[in-house]
Amino acid sequence: MTRKYIYIYIYIILKVRARVGANNKTLINNQSHLIEMRNTLMLSDLPGDLLEEILCRVPATSLKQLRSTCKQWNNLFNNGRFTRKHLDKAPKDFQNLMLSDSRVFSMSVSFHGIPSVEATCELSLIDSFSSFEDKFEISQVFHCDGLLLCTDADNTRIVVWNPCTGKTRWIEPNNRCYYYAFGSYLDKSYGNSYKILSYSGYGYENQELAIYEINSQSWRFLDVTRDCILERYTDYGVSLKGHTYWFASDEKEKNLSVFLVSFDYTTERFRRLRLPYQCPDYNTASLSVVREEKLAVLLQRENTSRTEIWVTSRIGETKVVSWSMVLAVDFPSELFILSGISFLVDAEKKFVVCCDNYFGEDEYDTKNLVHIVGENNKVREVNFGVSESSWPFLFNYVPSLIQIWEGVGGKRKRVE
């Protein structure tokens, strides 16, 4: 890269920092040097491929601030090929989100000094079909590539939402399957694309499966041979590198160990993945994702308070997946960990953040709780207030510019 383009790169980075609130004094000093350069050098001088290489390495949350400053950049940010390239190359802005009382909140988690967690802001999803622009009440949420698949409590409304760009796509629901997952695959015609998998429930044989293809905008039933049953330790699977993962058990041999099963949206097939150790059942089991690279499981066997958090090797790098235990804690007896718990883990700092729901003696005495637990078994509890609707759900999120609302034709069809 020539010095000329290095200066342009510096200019772009400074512009990004200015838009996201960098120190004004520093910017003034830097901009005094750039003013003269800008008089003789315009962004139009920058070759398109080099501009892409620069911008695809700037975090999505920073790029969205620049959308309105340059028509050329705005067109680029709307280009599907660029947004996919950006997803692959841009630094990951890892965030923690929580679904609580039908709303999604951004969470700040700190392990320095006294561990703390707090909701910093609400990510508002406006109901496009409401005359008064009411907020959409979310019952389930599923994350993949910076997109959130959200459903309502009655499973009559489905929307794919990008909180970073604010764009949405509303989808006709499947009337026969009430649980949903979301993943990506490589389409020969469209490139990277997305599908929604719906299934009829947990814990029994002959679970119906249906697929919604974003490109064709239609549902179809999935005729696939399975030898396992999806187990309801939690209402949510997790997405990692386009695949969805759940807990499962053998369809014929019910006494065999519980395992993980993944769904590949390209081949539309299931594949088994062994857990760290064999166990026919767990008191508590939950899945999470670590930095968009690894799977994590929280496992608590029956009749014990010992809870273990295991993390895999990087998914996709080798055919064989290995497990490492990063944390083992004995939860206090007064902390009753339920199967519906969701969690995040910091493998380096040896902390786990759990989110569940407390039920009091009064049917209206319910509240959402977040627990921070470290190697010393000390539990810090944060009360997030009275819960009136959905079970709280804590999950990882990485903002992106990915969009699925342009250039896809096809007539919308409904599964009856």
From Swiss-Prot:
SMART domains assigned: FBOX (SM00256)
- Domain (F-box): residue spans on this chain: 40-86
- Pfam entry (one): FBA_1
Matches recorded under InterPro entries: F-box-assoc_dom_typ1 (IPR006527), F-box-assoc_interact_dom (IPR017451), F-box-like_dom_sf (IPR036047), F-box_dom (IPR001810), Gal_Oxase/kelch_b-propeller (IPR011043), SCF_F-box_component (IPR050796)
SUPFAM superfamilies from the entry? F-box domain, Galactose oxidase, central domain
Q: What is the protein name stated in its UniProt record? A: Probable F-box protein At5g47300
